[in-house]
């Protein structure tokens, strides 16, 4: 399992290449912004069919991470569904797949701005969740400490010998972690955007996702 280990508020964590964060002591896998049903919502609103493969791709990667970690707890940090109508319109195959992934483990859906209400799937539905020194919620709050959130879909630009590439990234400073979007068809906000630059402290680091996740100083 390719990962990048780091400490946060005295807790040993690891960022996986997928953008998930793994808390081994709690056997907890944390992901954010799955945006399941995004292609359905795009088609519904625009009338233009979108490729319907994003749900399968996202759930496949989630299944792989669960298998690799043998997680007993899965926390989804909000915007797990692109909207509540998209959640209701999930194909039966996808609903059964989620049910299989939930079997034998605790599953927590944190409310997001795209999916603020309860959904017709198993698991607990919470506005936020505290565990030890950490608090899990969808959107970062000013002044928070030990906060793990998502929402902003952070990404960084990485120079290579050939060109500059853009990759999703886990942002970490002394107060908070912001996870990238886990879902397929999700865009991102560059770490040098004033919103993220304002949220993250001067010591912030970025863990660049991919086959070999690596920690760098957060680009500003």
Write out the residue ranges for each language-model feature.
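Extended recognition/assembly regions associated with phosphoester-bond processing machinery
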Residues: 1-76, 80-220
């Amino acid at each position: 399992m390719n990962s990048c280990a780091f400490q946060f508020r005295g807790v040993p964590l690891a960022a996986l290449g997928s953008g998930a964060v793994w808390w081994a002591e709690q056997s907890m896998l944390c992901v954010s912004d799955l945006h399941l049903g995004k292609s359905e919502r795009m088609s519904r609103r625009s009338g233009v069919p979108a490729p319907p493969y994003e749900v399968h791709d996202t759930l496949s990667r989630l299944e792989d991470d669960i298998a690799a970690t043998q997680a007993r707890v899965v926390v989804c940090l909000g915007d797990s569904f692109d909207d509540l109508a998209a959640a209701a319109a999930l194909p039966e195959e996808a609903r059964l797949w989620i049910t299989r992934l939930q079997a034998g483990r605790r599953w927590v859906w944190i409310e997001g701005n795209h999916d603020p209400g309860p959904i017709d799937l198993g698991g607990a539905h919470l506005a936020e969740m505290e565990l030890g020194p950490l608090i899990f919620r969808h959107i970062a709050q000013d002044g928070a400490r030990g906060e793990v959130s998502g929402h902003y879909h952070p990404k960084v630009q990485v120079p290579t010998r050939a060109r500059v590439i853009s990759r999703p990234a886990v942002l970490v400073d002394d107060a908070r972690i912001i996870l990238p979007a886990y879902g397929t068809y999700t865009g991102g906000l560059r770490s040098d955007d004033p919103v993220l630059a304002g949220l993250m402290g001067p010591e912030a680091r970025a863990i660049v996702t991919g086959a070999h996740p690596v920690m760098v100083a957060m680009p500003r």
